[in-house]
UniProtKB/Swiss-Prot annotation:
This protein's name: DNA ligase
Record family assignment: Belongs to the ATP-dependent DNA ligase family.
Listed Gene3D superfamilies: DNA ligase, ATP-dependent, N-terminal domain, DNA ligase/mRNA capping enzyme, Nucleic acid-binding proteins
GO biological process, any: DNA recombination
InterPro entries, sorted: ATP-dep_DNA_ligase, DNA_ligae_ATP-dep_bac/arc, DNA_ligase_ATP-dep, DNA_ligase_ATP-dep_C, DNA_ligase_ATP-dep_cent, DNA_ligase_ATP-dep_CS, DNA_ligase_ATP-dep_N, DNA_ligase_N_sf
EC number: 6.5.1.1
Keyword Nucleotide-binding appears in the UniProt entry: yes
Organism listed in the record: Methanothermobacter thermautotrophicus (Methanobacterium thermoformicicum)
Length: 557
């Protein structure tokens, strides 16, 4: 296998970071992908996203900024305070590391140039470090890598460890680069990525097997895909008129899950592709009883019901977050599952129309009332519009969010928000935004982050762009919890201002979207209010600048 020096990769990162032009980034990446040895291609592709594992992998590096700073301190020979000062000065741990490493006087004897294979294997080893001495093991691994790093390499190694590469490359740019590098249809690359959620695999297949190989990639139980997403309907009547015929379903206020059976193993994934099987034993037991022993992928919503009504979304988060005391929580906060789609049963079904997929779901599901059921659904057309209106009113009366309105002829399109699936809610539309910073309070509230700086994702560049500050909608306990999380994610603090690794997602309601030069997005939200914390979403799931602009133009705001 032809070696690839990590410095060569770092220089590519630097070129990507130095341009804002999408086409230029695409060509830089295509050039790299063409030149990389086939054995390294999947790893390099994932590294270009600033990740070490595919998004659906259960493996995590488990390294926070404090642990990383400790390793830098040992390698460079400076204090933690000096590192914090440099991060504050540079505004980024990568740039701070580069500056500190450029002043390093110690040299590792007999050090060899870092290779991508070595760096990648040692970063993966971080996820395997466990037990009583896990933190020490992780520090030793980081020191082993960083002690051989040159300043530019240190910039990108440290950013990769925190999964915050900051070179303006998103999945769309990498898909385009794969298509250009190996001269294959971009639509085939996009579809292959939607069905595998593994750009490393897609790149390898595109190179070795071309378009025929990409066409053969398909759904596989055990490997989750991003869910099909819904647009907001302005009214039930207009949605039914546009679709002609639709399945209308109760919109449950819970956590959307994808359940996979592969052989004897059943896995339950959230919308952010996180495996929560161990946290929801009653759901696992229920689906094993209610569904056949065939391989399948089904989709549904997990909710909590208390006193006959849906309970707060936060109760569900409490369940799926906990790794301990699961038996007690299972008794105190019991869960129910409502299934509404099947993506795979004895073969992929996503290209089949919804009406057929629903028939398959109902044929394989043996409902267990109160535990595992099919979603409540009515078949609606222009002639029986009243049935949809009845379902909406009934769903709201029972404490649910509203209804889903789905085109009966639509295939399942993973990861796409389109007009084949619509939602109509009693409450105004909201945005899912990511926290990038905040401001601490004063006086008795000086220990709490009282105002949160929010951002959307620019889908063209992949960058986060600020759009609002929000300071209302959170009770004191939630503020305390969020402030502790912010401190753990801290990248920089200056006075009362804090900047954090973008990880916390808030669902925010607002009265209006307006143009504003104050924020990087060019837009702002009037009277924003936090509706809930969205720990069921990943940073890739947040709303985009394109959606904000669309809402602004349509006047939904």
């Amino acid at each position: 296998m032809k070696e690839l020096l990590y410095m060569e990769l770092a220089e590519v990162y630097h070129r990507l970071e130095s341009t804002t032009k999408r086409l230029e980034k695409t060509e830089i990446l295509a050039e790299l992908l063409r030149s990389v040895d086939k054995e390294l291609l999947p790893d390099v592709t994932i590294l270009m996203l600033g990740r070490v594992f595919p998004i659906w992998s259960e493996e995590e590096l488990g390294v926070g900024i404090k642990l990383l700073m400790k390793a830098i301190s040992l390698v460079v020979g400076v204090s933690m305070d000096e590192i914090e000062d440099e991060i504050r000065e540079q505004g980024d741990i990568g740039l701070a590391s580069e500056k500190l490493f450029s002043r390093k006087t110690q040299t590792t004897f007999f050090s060899q140039p870092l290779t991508v294979e070595f760096v990648y294997s040692r970063l993966k080893a971080l996820a395997s470090a466990s037990g009583d001495r896990a933190q020490s093991k992780k520090i030793n691994i980081l020191v082993e890598v960083l002690s051989q790093a040159k300043p530019l390499e240190a910039r990108y190694i440290t950013r990769t460890v925190l999964e915050e590469l900051r070179v303006g490359v998103a999945e769309g740019i990498i898909r385009d680069a794969i298509a250009r590098a190996f001269e294959v249809d971009p639509a085939l690359v996009e579809r292959a990525h939607m069905l595998t959620n593994d750009l490393g695999m897609v790149a390898a297949v595109a190179r070795e097997e071309g378009e025929p190989g990409l066409g053969r990639l398909n759904l596989e139980p055990g490997r989750p895909v991003k869910p099909m997403l819904a647009q907001l309907a302005s009214s039930i009547e207009s949605a039914i008129t546009e679709l002609g015929r639709a399945f209308c379903e109760t919109k449950y206020d819970g956590i959307r899950v994808q359940i996979h059976r592969c052989g004897d193993e059943v896995s339950i994934f959230t919308r952010r592709l996180e495996n929560i099987t161990a946290a929801v034993p009653e759901i696992l037991e229920g689906v094993e009883e209610a569904l056949p022993a065939d391989d399948y992928i089904v989709e549904g919503e997990i909710i909590v019901t208390m006193d006959g009504r849906p309970a707060s979304f936060q109760y569900i988060l409490q369940r799926v977050r906990r790794k301990y005391d699961v038996d007690r929580l299972t008794r105190e906060v019991p869960l129910s599952l409502f299934l509404f789609d099947v993506l795979y049963h004895r073969g992929p079904l996503i290209d089949e129309p919804l009406w057929h997929r629903r028939e398959v779901l109902e044929s394989i599901l043996s409902e267990i009332p109160g535990r595992v059921e099919a979603s409540r659904m009515v078949d609606v057309g222009p002639d029986n519009l009243d049935d949809a209106l009845w379902l909406f009113k009934e769903s709201i009366r029972e404490g649910h969010e509203g209804i889903m309105i789905k085109d009966t002829e639509a295939p399942y399109i993973p990861g796409i928000r389109g007009k084949k699936m619509l939602k109509f809610k009693a409450e105004p539309e909201t945005l899912d935004l990511i926290v990038v910073g905040g401001t601490y309070g004063r006086g008795k509230r000086a220990h709490l982050v009282g105002s949160y700086l929010l951002a959307v994702r620019d889908e063209k560049s992949g960058e986060l762009k600020t759009i609002a500050h929000v300071a209302t909608g959170l009770d004191d306990q939630t503020l305390q919890d969020l402030s502790e999380r912010m401190e753990n994610l801290k990248v920089e603090r200056r006075g009362r201002k804090i900047r954090v690794k973008p990880e916390i997602i808030l669902e925010v309601a607002y009265s209006e979207i307006v143009r504003s030069p104050e924020y990087e997005s060019g837009y702002s939200l009037r009277f924003p209010v936090v509706k809930r914390i969205r720990d069921d979403l990943s940073p890739d799931d947040i709303d985009t600048l394109g959606r904000v602009i669309s809402l602004f133009k349509q006047g939904f705001s």
